[in-house]
């Protein structure tokens, strides 16, 4: 992604060299010893820097994906932390970044590493979720009721095994989505609501094997051109994902098997139809589901978390 080289925001130098993948993985996890007030102030500073990064690079989709993929490895059937996976910052390590489902996410990590370096007291686990929620909000989406104070895992040996994240084209899409999301403790309503985040971003065939090399909506960027988007305005968070899947009138818009099934499965369809007709209802349910996802598997210090509001 070309935006990796456009780190123009307050306090960061565009001339600063990007760290290597190996260097990123060796960065130490942050200490949680700071007082809650100081921690909140540092988190607010990081949030402002994320906003500037979004303005200068239009990297909203990949930051959303970064937060999701760190949290989405959670297994409710495993009680031991961090073996349960989830939002613990493990995605910063090379071994997990190389999982097939995480193709391209090293670019997201390189984008936000300067923010991590500037705000050393913010954990990777918090920064990933902060960046994801902020990207949703800055793209026009709902305010996510976030809390912070997540503890980082310390070493790559604590990364979850590969295969816990959803695939795009499984043989039985509805069964696959339920297997993955039920394992996290999420419901059919939350599956459909969270799927609506595909209103942002593009699929690149060289990474996922899905989508066209380019379309009329993506051939000129912003950012690196190419890929196929789910919606025509793929940097705007709204309910057009559901409308476009339902109508299927534009061959330049992507519909994966796991997208189409939202209007084919009888339980999923209830929510997909609702969200296509009512953006406010979608925003309300999405904000709740996103916040829940961001907390999966997280260990908080302080135990009740830190609010920025």
Swiss-Prot record:
Residues 1-32 form a transit peptide. Residues 197-229 are annotated as: Disordered. K(+) binds at residues 199, 231, 238. CDD domains: ascorbate_peroxidase. It holds the Pfam family peroxidase. GO terms for biological process: cellular response to oxidative stress; hydrogen peroxide catabolic process; response to reactive oxygen species. GO terms for molecular function: heme binding; L-ascorbate peroxidase activity; metal ion binding; peroxidase activity. It is found in: Plastid, Chloroplast stroma; Mitochondrion. InterPro entries: Ccp1-like (IPR044831), Haem_peroxidase (IPR002016), Haem_peroxidase_sf (IPR010255), Peroxidase_I (IPR002207), Peroxidases_heam-ligand_BS (IPR019793). Heme b binds at residue 198. GO terms for cellular component: chloroplast stroma; mitochondrion. The keyword Cell membrane does not apply. It is an enzyme of class 1 (oxidoreductase). Its cofactor is heme b. The record marks 65 as: Transition state stabilizer. Expressed in leaves, stems and flowers. Its EC number is 1.11.1.11. It comes from the Eukaryota. The active site is at residue 69. Binds 1 heme b (iron(II)-protoporphyrin IX) group. Residues 203-217 have a biased composition (Basic and acidic residues). Keywords: Calcium, Chloroplast, Heme, Hydrogen peroxide, Iron, Metal-binding, Mitochondrion, Oxidoreductase, Peroxidase, Plastid, Potassium, Transit peptide. Belongs to the peroxidase family. Ascorbate peroxidase subfamily. Plays a key role in hydrogen peroxide removal. Binds one cation per subunit; probably K(+), but might also be Ca(2+). This is Probable L-ascorbate peroxidase 6, chloroplastic/mitochondrial. It comes from Oryza sativa subsp. japonica.
